[in-house]
Each structure stands twice: as structure tokens, then as C-alpha cells.
Regions:
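Extracytoplasmic/lumenal domain signature
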Residues: 1-167
Length: 167
């Protein structure tokens, strides 16, 4: 099923990015953690927005140049090369991606991404996506609340699980 989420600047209303085929996303400190078609990903939104702005500027400049004027050909080639470089750099804003079923909930707590799925809750490292911890729960893990070294998980079946982590 096609899902689309758009992120905009709350002050200006300007579109920052659009996520296609996305079921869940959480954004914090310039990073987006999102689920798209069997993958969980981390995207550097701050860098991506900067690069997309530059890309838009270069594409607009390219459109203004008349390709029929021979003296413009070198400038056109330089802009095309820069556009290609920017497009490659935008792809590198995807910091990591892992195979993962669709989550019911995503929460960032410190340097951890907490993920609730059917009958399980997991904690992933936000820098790498590598699993740090997981535990079975009864039902779909919708409510994820990290607080004071504990993780409280509520499910669609009414179960509340509490996990305590030692420092």
C-alpha cells in the first residue's frame, strides 16, 4: 500500500522532504528513522535538505542557460557535473538500512531506537541500526515509554510489560 509522509518547516511551511511508501517515522536531531517496505532506515535529513537546496539552485541555473550559444557549453557541462555530484551525495544521506518488519511504534531515547512490533519490542543502536536488545511481549507493541532506566510497553491486548535496565 502506498503511504506518503511529508515533513515541513513549522515556521515557514516549506517542504523539507517527502517519504514515499513509509509506514512510520520519527525525526530527532536532524535524523529520520523510518520504515519503508520491509526496511528500517536512518536518513540524515539536515544534510539532505542542504544538498537538495543546492541541487534546486543548480537545476534552475541550468534551465536559464541557452544551450544553443556555443560559449555556454562549458558552463552547461560544469553544472551537469555538479548536479550529478549532488545527486550522488544525496544518496549518501541514507546512513543505514536493515531488513525489518513494519513497526507499530518507533521511539528514540538517547542513542537508542525503540521499536515495537507484533509480539516483540527491540532496541537498536541509532548510529548503526544494530540490535542491542529484544524481548517478547504479548500482542502488538503500540505504547513504548522509556523512563528512568525502564521501558514500559503496552500492547493491543491490554498487557503492560515493564523492563528495567541496570546502568
Amino acid at each position: 500500500r502506498d503511504e506518503q509522509l511529508r515533513v515541513a518547516d513549522p515556521k515557514s511551511g516549506k517542504r523539507l522532504t517527502t517519504f514515499n511508501n513509509t509506514t512510520r517515522v520519527v525525526v530527532t536531531q536532524g535524523k529520520a528513522f523510518l520504515h519503508t517496505i520491509d526496511n528500517l532506515q536512518c536518513l540524515d535529513l539536515t544534510r539532505k535538505a542542504q544538498l537538495e537546496t543546492l541541487l534546486g539552485t543548480q537545476k534552475a541555473a541550468l534551465k536559464k542557460i541557452d544551450p544553443k550559444v556555443e560559449t555556454n557549453l562549458a558552463q552547461i557541462e560544469a553544472l551537469k557535473k555538479e548536479i550529478s555530484t549532488l545527486q550522488t551525495q544525496i544518496k549518501s544521506c541514507l546512513l543505514w538500512t536493515i531488513d525489518h518488519p513494519a513497526p507499530f511504534e518507533l521511539v528514540v531515547a538517547g542513542d537508542q531506537l525503540i521499536v515495537g512490533i507484533d509480539n516483540q519490542v527491540s532496541i537498536l543502536d541509532i548510529k548503526t541500526g544494530k540490535p542491542l536488545w529484544q524481548h517478547k511481549v504479548t500482542g502488538k507493541a503500540y505504547g513504548l515509554t522509556p523512563a528512568e532506566g525502564r521501558l514500559i510497553v503496552s500492547t493491543d491486548l491490554g498487557h503492560i510489560h515493564t523492563f528495567h535496565f541496570q546502568p
